[in-house]
Curated annotation (Swiss-Prot):
Record-listed Phosphothreonine modification sites: T222
PANTHER family from the UniProt entry: TORSIN-1A-INTERACTING PROTEIN, TORSIN-1A-INTERACTING PROTEIN 1
Coarse class of the protein's main subcellular location: nucleus
Sites bearing Phosphoserine, chain numbering: S60, S134, S142, S155, S157, S189, S228, S231, S242, S316
Residue ranges crossing the lipid bilayer per the database entry: 340-360
InterPro entries given in the database record: LAP1C-like_C_sf, TOIP1/2, TOIP1/2_C, TOIP1/2_N
All ranges on the Nuclear side of the membrane: 1-339
Name this protein carries in UniProt: Torsin-1A-interacting protein 1
Membrane topology: Single-pass membrane protein
Family membership noted in the UniProt record: Belongs to the TOR1AIP family.
Lineage, opening ranks: Eukaryota, Metazoa, Chordata, Craniata, Vertebrata
Length: 583
């Protein structure tokens, strides 16, 4: 009758099949192939012209309804007061075997509520079987009896299945032994539930997970079939450091039907990673509560093993990132050390270059100071200003950095009574300045060139100074500067200029002998400077002097004076000095 449902209890597992009748197909149209999901070669039912068309069972999309196979129509229809007739009553033996072989197990209906008396009897039978089974398990000492333990556990589960469905968590159901062990059969004979189930998403958690696949046995299977079905227990452990391809392969093998052919289904087959001990013999002998406790212990042990494995080589990504984060500082520290080494070397070279020349010059200054002290001890009649100002002026020039900004020009003057002292002291001061180089200062006598041509004297003076300075001499003394031809003195623009002097690291000592007989010691340096200036102006610009007008003028003289008058110091006569010899 349309709209009515019937239930067939079969397979001894409490499974029920819901089917929905379909309206008859019109006459003369060939019925489609069976939709039993097993892909068998059974001929499709056809509508005979002499009788009404049979109703066809199709897949229903409603959750409570299940896609059943073809059964006699009398099995589907029943009266409201009649008892439901199991569908197996109308099947032939071959049809029953075919249904069993096709693993046509779909969604199960809810368990029917059992009465208190029936539940008590089931508990009594279960406890009795558990005690018997535990006694038999104690006698199993060798691994060779694992097959027997599997069969005992299978028989225990079979008896329990008659009373109530198995309470163990079943994640997926596989096909029977004949379906699994025959790769040559058609793909359509695979488990329809596996075809309809959506593969679960990959768990993002890195903890190890245990996936168990247990084949529920069916009625009528042989002992080998039960043993083979119970041997399909696989435990897969996915850790954080597992290879991604291996992880995906493990997930695909657990949830896709194509992986059924790749799984080994031999007796006692048990796959476990991380060298976990075999759990099958003891697991089949435990009740559901012990199964849960064992699963918890497994997860704890595998998590600990993953931690140890991460510590001893297969480090986690976080540890790798930390090491990668620590490694760049090591490389940077090496680079910093190299840069520090280069910096220290450059600093050492700079210090050496900076102090090398000053050390040399300091030695030259010390040598000059020693020479000046000796002269001071010899010429005791000289004014203190001469030693103090003269020594400081020349020391400052020696200590100045290279290249020096300008040459050192020292002008010494004296009266007629100190002419010999002026000549000796000027030469000795110039030699003291160049004493570090152990060379003798350049000497030019102006009195011997007084009668010569101005241009010729100019050329000779220029030649002597240039050759001497280029040959390493750094000091020169010009005696009787006032006796040189007026025009020839213009060459000293070249050597005494403040900014554009030809040689700046040299010292020139000029002497001017006044016409006065005695130079008073009470005169100050400013007065002595004015006296020397007036005297040179008279000598170089007087109209009585031949050719002086054509070669020198007051403007040129003022420019020359500004260049040679850096420091003007007086020289006093010495009583100990003998004629013709220096102290």
């Amino acid at each position: 009758m349309a709209g009515e449902r019937w239930r067939a209890e079969g397979l001894g597992e409490g499974w029920a099949i819901y089917v929905t009748p379909r309206a008859p197909i019109r006459e003369g149209r060939r019925r489609l192939a069976t939709q039993n999901g097993d892909g068998s070669d059974a001929p499709a039912y056809e509508t005979h012209p002499s009788r009404h068309g049979r109703r066809e069972v199709r897949f229903s999309e409603e959750p409570p309804e299940v896609y059943g196979d073809f059964e006699p129509r009398a099995a589907k229809e029943r009266s409201p007061g009649e008892r439901r007739t199991p569908p197996e009553k109308f099947r032939s033996d071959s049809a029953k075997e075919e249904v069993r072989e096709s693993a046509y197990n779909l969604r199960s209906r809810q368990r029917r509520q059992r009465g208190p008396q029936e539940a008590e009897e089931m508990k009594t039978r279960r406890s009795t079987r558990l005690e018997q089974h535990s006694q038999q398990a104690q006698q199993q000492l060798s691994p060779a009896t694992s097959g027997r333990g599997l069969r005992d556990a299978q028989s225990l589960s079979e008896d329990r299945g008659e009373d109530e469905p198995s309470s163990q968590p079943v994640t997926s159901q596989t096909v029977s032994k004949k379906t699994v062990r025959t790769p040559e059969t058609s793909v359509m004979s695979e488990d329809p539930i596996s075809n309809l189930c959506r593969p679960p998403l990959r768990s993002p958690r890195p903890d190890a997970s245990i996936v168990q696949h247990i084949n529920p046995f069916e009625e009528g299977e042989t002992e080998d079939d039960l043993e083979s079905s119970y041997s399909d227990v696989t435990i897969r452990i996915r850790s954080r450091d597992s290879v991604e391809s291996r992880d995906e392969a493990a997930v695909a093998a657990g949830h896709h039907p194509d992986s059924l052919w790749g799984l080994p289904h031999s007796r006692g087959d048990f796959t476990a990673h991380e060298n976990q001990p075999s759990l099958l013999p003891t697991g089949c002998q435990k009740n559901p509560q012990e199964w849960v406790e064992q699963a918890v212990r497994m997860r704890t042990r595998m998590a600990y093993n993953n931690i140890q494995k991460s510590d001893f080589g297969n480090q986690s990504p976080s540890t790798s990132r930390q090491q990668a984060a620590v490694q760049p500082p090591d490389e940077s520290s090496v680079k910093i050390k190299w840069w520090l080494l280069i910096l220290v070397a450059a600093l050492a070279m700079g210090i050496y270059w900076f102090f090398h020349t000053p050390v040399v010059e300091t030695t030259a200054v010390q040598e000059f100071q020693n020479q000046m002290k000796q002269l001071q001890s010899k010429y005791q009649s000289q004014d203190e200003k001469l030693w103090k100002r003269g020594t400081t002026f020349l020391e400052k020039h020696l200590n100045s950095s290279l290249p020096r900004p300008q040459p050192a020009i020292l002008l010494l003057t004296a009266a007629q009574d100190a002419a010999e002292v002026l000549k000796c002291l000027s030469e000795q001061i110039a030699d003291a300045y160049s004493s570090f180089r152990s060379v003798r200062a350049i000497r030019i006598d102006g009195a011997g060139k007084a009668a010569q041509d101005s241009d010729l004297v100019k050329h000779e003076v220029d030649q002597e100074l240039t050759d001497g300075f280029r040959n390493g001499q750094n000091a020169a003394v010009v005696h009787r500067f006032e006796s040189l031809p007026a025009g020839s003195t213009l060459i000293f623009y070249k050597y005494c200029d403040h900014e554009n002097a030809a040689f700046k690291d040299v010292a020139l000592v000029l002497t001017v002998l006044l016409e006065e007989q005695t130079l008073e010691a009470s005169l100050g340096l400013k007065e002595i400077e004015e006296k020397v200036r007036d005297f040179l102006k008279v000598k170089f610009t007087s109209s009585d002097t031949a050719n002086s007008y054509n070669h020198m003028d007051p403007d040129k003289l003022n420019g020359l004076w500004s260049r040679i008058s850096h420091l003007v110091l007086p020289v006093q006569p010495e009583n100990a000095l003998k004629a013709g010899s220096c102290l």
